[in-house]
């Protein structure tokens, strides 16, 4: 029995990055031997065991053979005769196909170290094209390591393009796709994930609503970058630079989908894109079964982001309607995330990344003014039921009007 540290732990140590999760592969052992040593089986599809003390995952060396469509269409074979090299060749990228023994000696049969030095994301073997999920994984790694100068090797991008055209991407489950998408959006440069998917044709298959934004112009006076797709990528980058949560990043990605439906004769204006984009946002949300908080925020940001930008011009009644749409008195955090998404949208414009966004504090102030209205005096005046709700609305409206007068430009 020989035990090796494999994959990301080896890669990140060589890159000088923090190592969080460690995966181990066991060569020359059977499942019975692992059980005899106190390891606990957890793998449903192939032999994976938890270490009796550390709880880390140990997998028996295995080979795999394509036997059906999609991510799960594989037959696995694990036995003591499977070599380390045979186990490593089934992995996606050369930089993930290195192993270290217990003395720290490196095994690198597919030149992963060379590709690390050359900053290349390169597939290990032609079998890469058998697993459509790898298109998303490579794009995610590109987003993670873009800051270190990594790029996808041309021949790997070509394989990804073939996979995108094969129909295999449609076999991916919503859950597997969302897991990769959500992880990619939380990387330091999530816009690279979208760009790589576009470069290989996968974006047009998985998220055609976003792909359709590229080449659609916006008014240069508001958007010096002009292209709606380029703007979306910039907004996503700003969300990452400002360390926004997943829900905000997802909303930033989807906020302008309606612009892809604007007839060409109306370009570069996009009147009503907030409303026309809602069905598209719903479709993308449902396609990937995004978490409820991500779905809700994406729809609200899509519908109301222009309100956010025009906050200082809105009537008091419109401001109150906006606050009520977000259920701000019970869910203040969601309104904060809306403000954040609006600010990222404003900053995602060429040359305007550092421009102040006074709308943010103005919206917070309006919400706070309305929140300070007390219910108890209205109860003491005898209001109840629907009359109480209307009286409370009028008092909040009065408070917002006073706030507007105090903060008039």
Swiss-Prot record:
UniProt comment concerning the protein's domains? Comprises two domains: an N-terminal domain containing the nucleotidyltransferase activity and a C-terminal HD domain associated with both phosphodiesterase and phosphatase activities.
- How is its cofactor bound, per UniProt? Magnesium is required for nucleotidyltransferase activity.
The record lists ATP as bound by 8, 11, 91, 137, 140
Which GO molecular-function terms appear in the entry? ATP binding; CCA tRNA nucleotidyltransferase activity; cyclic-nucleotide phosphodiesterase activity; magnesium ion binding; phosphatase activity; tRNA binding
Its cofactor is:
Mg(2+); Ni(2+)
What is the annotated quaternary arrangement, including any partners? Monomer. Can also form homodimers and oligomers.
Task: List residues binding Mg(2+).
Answer: 21, 23
Q: What keywords are annotated for this sequence in UniProt?
A: ATP-binding, Hydrolase, Magnesium, Metal-binding, Multifunctional enzyme, Nickel, Nucleotide-binding, Nucleotidyltransferase, RNA repair, RNA-binding, Transferase, tRNA processing
Q: What is its EC number?
A: 2.7.7.72, 3.1.3.-, 3.1.4.-
What is the protein name given in its UniProt record? Multifunctional CCA protein
Q: What does the record's miscellaneous section state?
A: A single active site specifically recognizes both ATP and CTP and is responsible for their addition.
Catalytic activity from the UniProt record: a tRNA precursor + 2 CTP + ATP = a tRNA with a 3' CCA end + 3 diphosphate; a tRNA with a 3' CCA end + 2 CTP + ATP = a tRNA with a 3' CCACCA end + 3 diphosphate
Pfam families for the chain: HD, PolyA_pol, PolyA_pol_RNAbd
Q: Name one GO biological process term.
A: tRNA 3'-terminal CCA addition
Family per UniProt? Belongs to the tRNA nucleotidyltransferase/poly(A) polymerase family. Bacterial CCA-adding enzyme type 1 subfamily.
Q: Which residues form the signal peptide?
A: none
Say yes or no: keyword Magnesium present.
yes
Q: Does the keyword Glycosyltransferase feature in the UniProt annotation? A: no
Cite the binding residues for CTP: 8, 11, 91, 137, 140
Q: CDD domains of this UniProt entry?
A: HDc, NT_ClassII-CCAase
């Amino acid at each position: 029995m020989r035990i090796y540290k494999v994959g990301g732990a080896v890669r990140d140590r060589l890159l000088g990055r923090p190592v969080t999760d460690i995966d181990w592969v066991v060569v020359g052992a059977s499942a019975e031997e692992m059980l005899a040593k106190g390891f606990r089986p957890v793998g449903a599809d192939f032999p994976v065991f938890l270490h009796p003390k550390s709880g880390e995952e140990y997998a028996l060396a295995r080979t795999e053979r394509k036997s059906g469509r999609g991510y799960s269409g594989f037959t696995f074979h694990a036995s003591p005769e499977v070599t380390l090299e045979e186990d490593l060749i089934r992995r996606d990228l050369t930089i993930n196909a290195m192993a270290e023994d217990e003395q720290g000696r490196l095994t690198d049969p597919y030149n992963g170290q060379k590709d690390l030095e050359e900053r290349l994301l390169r597939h290990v073997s032609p079998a890469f094209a058998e697993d459509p999920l790898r298109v998303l994984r490579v794009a995610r790694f590109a987003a993670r390591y873009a800051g270190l100068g990594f790029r996808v090797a041309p021949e790997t991008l070509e394989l990804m393009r073939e996979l995108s055209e094969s129909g295999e991407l449609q076999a991916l489950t919503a859950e597997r796709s969302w897991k990769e998408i959500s992880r990619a959006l939380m990387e330091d440069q999530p816009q690279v994930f979208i760009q790589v998917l576009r470069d290989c044709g996968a974006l047009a298959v998985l998220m055609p609503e976003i792909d359709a934004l590229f080449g659609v112009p916006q008014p240069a006076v508001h958007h010096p970058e002009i292209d709606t797709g380029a703007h979306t990528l910039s907004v996503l980058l700003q969300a990452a630079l400002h360390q926004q949560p997943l829900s905000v990043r997802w909303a930033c990605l989807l906020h302008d989908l309606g612009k892809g439906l604007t007839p060409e004769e109306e370009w570069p204006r996009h009147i009503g894109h907030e409303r026309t984009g809602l069905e598209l946002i719903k479709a993308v949300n449902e396609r990937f079964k995004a978490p409820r908080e991500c779905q809700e925020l994406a729809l609200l940001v899509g519908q109301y982001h222009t309100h956010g930008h025009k906050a200082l011009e809105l009537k008091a009644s419109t401001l109150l309607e906006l606050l009520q749409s977000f259920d701000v008195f019970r869910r203040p955090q969601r309104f904060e995330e809306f403000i954040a998404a609006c600010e990222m949208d404003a900053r995602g414009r060429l040359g305007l990344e550092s421009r102040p966004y006074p709308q943010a504090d103005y919206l917070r102030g309006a919400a706070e003014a309305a929140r300070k209205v007390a219910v108890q005096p209205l109860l003491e005046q005898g209001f109840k039921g629907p009359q109480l709700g209307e009286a409370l609305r009028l008092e909040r409206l009065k408070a917002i009007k006073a706030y507007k007068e105090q903060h008039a430009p």
